[in-house]
Amino acid sequence: MSRREKMIAKIKDLMYKPDSIRNIGICAHIDHGKTTLSDNLLAGAGMISEELAGDQRFLDFDEQEQARGITIDAANVSMVHNYKDEEYLINLIDTPGHVDFGGDVTRAMRAVDGAVVVVCAVEGIMPQTETVLRQALKENVKPVLFINKVDRLINELKLEPEELQKRFINIYMEANKLIKNMAPEDKKEEWAVDFTDGSVAFGSAYHNWAINVPMMQETGVNFKDIIDYCNDDKQKELAQKVPLSEVLLGMVVEHLPSPKVSQEYRVPNIWEGDIESPAGQGMITTSPDGPLAVMVTNVSVDKHAGEIATGRVYGGSIEKGTEVYLVGSHSKSRVQQVGVYFGPERVNTDAVPAGNIVYVAGAKGAIAGETICSPEDKIKEFEGLDHISEPVVTVAVEAKNTKDLPKLIEVLRQVAKEDPTIKVEINEETGEHLVSGMGELHLEVISYRIKDKGVEIQTSEPIVVYRETVSQLSPQVEGKSPNKHNRFYITVEPLEDELFKALQEGKLKEGKVKGKESANDFMEYGLDKEEARKVWDVYNRSVFINATRGIQYLDEVKELLIEGFESALNDGPLAKEIAMGLKFKLHDAKLHEDAVHRGPAQVLPAIRNAIYASMMSAGPTLLEPMQKVFINTPQDYMGPCTREIQNRRGQIVDMGQEGDMATIESKVPVAEMFGFAGDIRSAAEGRCLWSTEMSGFERLPREMQNQIVKEIRQRKGLSPEPYGPEHYVG
């Protein structure tokens, strides 16, 4: 039996022992060393050769990732680790740290129970560290901390033992501050990381060594020894005494929960069904014999096997050859293969039980976020995956050769399945399709993926996505149906800030409001009692309130009114961009007694026109997407860097100093960020580190609004000037 076969046999055996499984993610800011760390963990587990680890970028098996040297997708791998004479199955997901790929982090966090947060000792905790930690804690994922690149503190910054310890304590206190702010209430204390119990380790992923307090006690290696090893260029010897994989995987086994422990508190948080039901109990006890429950976190397309869905089995076992039911798409399909990952390759098994990360071939039509169960035991679906950022940059994509048109549409649908954070609009009439993503790099990689699937394309210059809103209360507006027999009286005003923020952060759910149980939630975030009890629908961070009393037949047209409200918000009156942050009230309605005269063809135009007219008479405003930009640069380059930000309509939010490095935090409109990478590099002569993260939408300066509205409308083939309210209700 070869070593590989032995390893696979162990994996197949351990996956039936949920106490011995750890599902973990590795997450960090870009370039803090996640993939190098993952490679060396694999080498320690005997999966790749130690010489190649670190340079091999084993988990970056996409050509784009190897070429750019960054992780774009979240990659999966399973390995076996021996800790205190017990064997454990560790399922590892390496996630991207670049802000444009934050969607992969969100999806990976749904599949895991624990996270190793990697922080660079030189740079400390950076904005993206905070974002990935927030995503982990939001999904109830427990963190441990690894401080990486310690050799650089010693060899480049020449720090003494006391200074080293001080640097570590700063990072660890900062990490705990974030954990205490963002962890679930009952876990704030329990999940704080601690040097003494070994839930914090430090080392060098590149040089393959790591140490924590328990390991120091066991081996007798102390801070001074570490400095000597680094100074004498003997890190290879150090790696033999305190190997990275021993320390890190030991920390994972000791401090991160098994599925058996974590599913008890995670399932109620991500599944809306009845916990007392057989499915609920099966998930909470991680039973391989309970009703099947799988949450799909990722879908990729394989040249030979077709669509491959990766996900987490929460309950029951998924078996090869059985029929399964996809809850979201209401469809059945037959499972052709199931199995687990072993590096980039997939290992087929007959079944994969609860508590494991699984791949499934044959779940046709599944997308990330789908719930798979058995057709006999249908269950409620898992909660949707909330991505922290939303697509803000769009490119138009066309096929270079007309013969590729049908293939391009197929490929775009595939790409949208593989990466749910992008938005694809397919227009079969014009052949111009729009792809929206999180930023320039995200769209470049998507264009590359389309070409990789065999379609040559042309892309337009990137276009920024705007939003529409209003700045004041409108007068009451009357919307008439084409037959003049139905009338609706509507006002609009800006939504309360507190409520808008709660919707943006996902504290309140969007969708039709059932019954009055949500009234308290709306009141908590600023609606008065009367309004809170009468909310009909929440959509695009806007609410639709029925403020009428005793109108005959209103219930019969309620669904149509909601449909009209939602479709009007999808393309606002100002520039056909999505509208958000609005509070609409229906004050009165006059309806024809005969149902024939109040069908969709009458009600939909009436309500849409009333909504458009009310918005156009309430100070219509464009909102533009903003990015936070963080820059680390030597003091001497602070001036040129701040000028670069200010030349792009940016505002400086905060400036700080750490040693001889300056830190600048700023906010810049996305529209001004194109080409920033090259410009900031030349401003600081290459001596700066920078990163961005989404910062929501803000009002466009009034003096720019007319020009930008005109440009958007012309691009969309509309008349250059938006229509006034009288056009809609005249």
Curated annotation (Swiss-Prot):
A molecular function (GO) term: GTPase activity
Sequence ranges assigned to domain tr-type G in this UniProt record: 19-260
SMART domains: EFG_C, EFG_IV
Residues with PTM Diphthamide: H597
Transmembrane region(s): none
One annotated Gene Ontology cellular component of this protein: ribonucleoprotein complex
Residues reported in the UniProt entry to bind GTP: 28-35, 94-98, 148-151
Family membership: Belongs to the TRAFAC class translation factor GTPase superfamily. Classic translation factor GTPase family. EF-G/EF-2 subfamily.
Name of the featured protein: Elongation factor 2
Gene name for this UniProt entry: fusA
